[in-house]
Amino acid sequence: MTELIRILHLNDLHSHFENFPKVKRFFHDNQAQPIETISLDLGDNIDKSHPLTEASSGKANVQLMNELGIELATIGNNEGVGLSKKDLDQVYKDSDFTVIVGNLKDNIIEPSWAKPYIIYETQQGTKLAFLAYTFPYYKTYEPNGWTIEDPIDCLKCHLQINEIKEANCRILMSHLGIRFDTRIAQEFSEIDLIIGAHTHHLFEEGELITGTYLAAAGKYGRFVGSIDITFDNHTLKDILISTYDTKQLTGYPSDSDWAKEIESEGKEQLRKESLISFPAPLSLEESCQLVMDAMLFYAGADVAIINSGLIVQPFEKDFSRKNLHESLPHKMRLAKLTVSSQELLEIYETIYQQGQFLAQQKIHGMGFRGKYFGEVLHSGFDYKNGKIVYNEKDIDAKEEVILVIVDQYYFASYFECLKTKKVDLLFPELLRDVVADYLINMTL
C-alpha cells in the first residue's frame, strides 16, 4: 500500500510578520488537501525586537503558530536564550502543538513543556520518529537557568531507544545550523531526513548527503517548505523536497494592513506602561549617559563602556515601554569583569580603535537590532595621554575595577582582547529591562 505524507515547515521567522498572511494561506491550503500533513516550526519564531512579541513575552507568536496549525515545534536560541527562564517556562502554556527538544534540561530533567522526541503514527500506521536539538550555546544557557547538552551525544543516545530504532522513518528537526546538519548526515545513516534552521540557509530542492535528505527554508518567512515522503507498506521509498518563495505567492492589500495592525497593537500595549517623565527630551549624549548609569547600578560596577549606536533614538520626554523598546530594541544583556587598570587601558584602547573602524558600519547579529556602531563612550573614568584616570587621578596599573559592557562585545569577533578574560554574563534582564528598572527606581 502506497502512502504519501506531506511535511510543511517554517523556520527562523524572528517575528517578521510581514509574510505571515501568505505563510498562513500556504499552510491552510495544503492542510485542506486530501493528503496527510504534518506542520512544523523549527525555532527562532520568537524575536522580541517586534513590539507585540515584546509586549506578550512571545505568547502572541505561539497564538499565531496555533493559527498556522503547527503540530510539532522546536526552539532556537531566541526562545532558549532570548527569553528568560521564567518566560520560556510559560510561553507554550496555551500552545496547540508539541514542543520537542532533546538536548535541554531543567537541572537534570526534561522541561515540563517539552519532550525529547516523539513517535508520530500516521493514519495508515506508519511510525515516524521526530527528534529535535537546538544549538548548544553553553555560555548563555547555563546563566539563564538551563543545562544545554551536546546534541551529537544526545542523538547517539536517542538512536539507541527501541521505539526510535524501530520507526519506519527518522526525522531530525534541527536548530543546529548547516555545519552540524552536514556532519550528522555524514555520520548517522539512521537519520533519513534533516529539516534545518539556525544558519538561515536555503535548500530550494533539498540536498542529499550519503543517503540523508536535507531541507531548509531560509529566514523571515521569505520561503516556506514542503516535503513529500512516500512509503510502500510502511517502507520509505522517496523524499521530494520543495521550497516556495513567498514573494511568488498570492498577496492581498489586507496582508500589509494586518502586519501594521499587530505592530500597532504591540506598541499600544507597551505605550500603556509609562516609565518616567523627563523635564525635557534627552539628547543622544544624555540618553547614552543614562544607559551607562543604569548599567553601572545594575552590575555594581565602577566603569562602563558602550557604543552610541546602541541607542537607536534619544529618549523622549514622556518615556514609556514603547519608547524604550524603540530606543533599545536589542537582544542584549550585560557582562561584567574585574580588571586591573592596565587591563582596562588595553580593553578601552582596543574597543576605541576598533570602534573608529566600525563607527559608520552597519552591524548585524549578536543581538544587535540597530543600524550603526556609532561612537565609543565611557563612564566612571577618563582616558588622557594614554592613561586611565579614575576619580580624577592616575591609578596604579595593578589596581582593580569592575567593568560592565554589553555582552555583544564579548561574543562578537571585533574585540579579541575580551575573549581571554573571565566574564560574568548577567541574566535574565535584557539591556532595556535594566534601564527600565533603573528609571522606575528614579521615580520612587
Q: Positions of the model-derived regions?
A:
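A short C-terminal boundary segment appended to hydrolase-like catalytic domains
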Residues: 232-319, 325, 439-444
